Amino acid sequence: MLQTTNKPPLTIRLCQPRGFCAGVDRAIQIVVLALKKYGAPVYVRHEIVHNRYVVEGLQSLGAVFIEELSEIPAEHRRSPVVFSAHGVPKSVPADAQARNLFYLDATCPLVSKVHKQAMRHQRLGRHVLLIGHAGHPEVIGTMGQLPEGAVTLVETEADAARLVPADPKALGFVTQTTLSVEDTAGIIRALRERFPDLQAPAAESICYATTNRQEAVKDTAPGADLYLIVGAPNSSNSRRLVEVAERAGATMSLLVQRAAEIPWNDIGTISTLGLSAGASAPEIIVDEIIDAFRQRFDVTIDLAITATETEDFPVMRVLRDVELTPADMAFVNGAA
């Protein structure tokens, strides 16, 4: 006998790729490996990635999150300290060395590439224009690679219009890795209109994961009654995905950290849901949200595959002799 359901039908357009990128995987793995090799506590300067679920999971394993190296107690000065995936100014490792601290730099290799691009511009005599968001840890880290005054932050096309450089013919730009691809292109166009000699970095600064996730959302947003992005409010790449969904045609687009944040009373009647996750959001939260909708709807999953990601960034040599258990790997990969 066929069973019937009184639940309304709902198609979930599930983006792939979504969630953790290679840089996030690597950063989380570094903290877990350090805990297994050296024991707790392992100190982490700033949130290793911008996601509370991940941070709280690492805290439960013995990680201690700090904002300044001066917060490390004297009795734990031999404990490892990990720098977050967003990168740090040059002054931070210098401070760690001055304090005789053992540090592990979990800066995403693609962020490190931007640092090198900025330094190359300076070596070639160019003033560096950094396209990014003021106050973001990645921007602070990139600006801190060069002497004060060597970098100018450009956040908007209006900033580009106001810019008065000392030498308009000696400019080079780099970008934060997690920006809106479309917004960044507009800022670069505005800069080039005013400064035709503006030099680009040797390679694209916006990372593959940012681009892939934005393209996936753009492809799946048209006609969606609601689009949910799993991510934290302080996650730049997650907030950009919300904006992309709105621009691409989703009726409503929201950022949520957990299923408990879904505003059921505001959703109304929906038949199509778009779903993706920022690069620092674990897959287990995506599963949690799908389960929450299954409780209220007769769900059909429409998997929208727009790219295949094979990138893998190895950890530093000092941690490669440590083996992770299947449970460790599940956490590192966002599945637990």
Swiss-Prot record:
Pathway: Isoprenoid biosynthesis; dimethylallyl diphosphate biosynthesis; dimethylallyl diphosphate from (2E)-4-hydroxy-3-methylbutenyl diphosphate: step 1/1; Isoprenoid biosynthesis; isopentenyl diphosphate biosynthesis via DXP pathway; isopentenyl diphosphate from 1-deoxy-D-xylulose 5-phosphate: step 6/6. Its EC number is 1.17.7.4. Signal peptide: none annotated. Binds 1 [4Fe-4S] cluster per subunit. One of its GO terms (molecular function) is metal ion binding. Isopentenyl diphosphate binds at H50, H86, H136, S235, S236, N237, S280. The active site is at E138 (proton donor). It catalyses: isopentenyl diphosphate + 2 oxidized [2Fe-2S]-[ferredoxin] + H2O = (2E)-4-hydroxy-3-methylbut-2-enyl diphosphate + 2 reduced [2Fe-2S]-[ferredoxin] + 2 H(+); dimethylallyl diphosphate + 2 oxidized [2Fe-2S]-[ferredoxin] + H2O = (2E)-4-hydroxy-3-methylbut-2-enyl diphosphate + 2 reduced [2Fe-2S]-[ferredoxin] + 2 H(+). This is 4-hydroxy-3-methylbut-2-enyl diphosphate reductase. [4Fe-4S] cluster binds at C21, C108, C207. Dimethylallyl diphosphate binds at H50, H86, H136, S235, S236, N237, S280. It holds the Pfam family LYTB. The keyword Oxidoreductase applies. It comes from Mesorhizobium japonicum (strain LMG 29417 / CECT 9101 / MAFF 303099) (Mesorhizobium loti (strain MAFF 303099)). Its cofactor is [4Fe-4S] cluster. InterPro entries: LytB/IspH. (2E)-4-hydroxy-3-methylbut-2-enyl diphosphate binds at H50, H86, H136, T177, S235, S236, N237, S280. Catalyzes the conversion of 1-hydroxy-2-methyl-2-(E)-butenyl 4-diphosphate (HMBPP) into a mixture of isopentenyl diphosphate (IPP) and dimethylallyl diphosphate (DMAPP). Acts in the terminal step of the DOXP/MEP pathway for isoprenoid precursor biosynthesis. GO terms for biological process: dimethylallyl diphosphate biosynthetic process; isopentenyl diphosphate biosynthetic process, methylerythritol 4-phosphate pathway; terpenoid biosynthetic process. Keywords: 4Fe-4S, Iron, Iron-sulfur, Isoprene biosynthesis, Metal-binding, Oxidoreductase. Belongs to the IspH family.
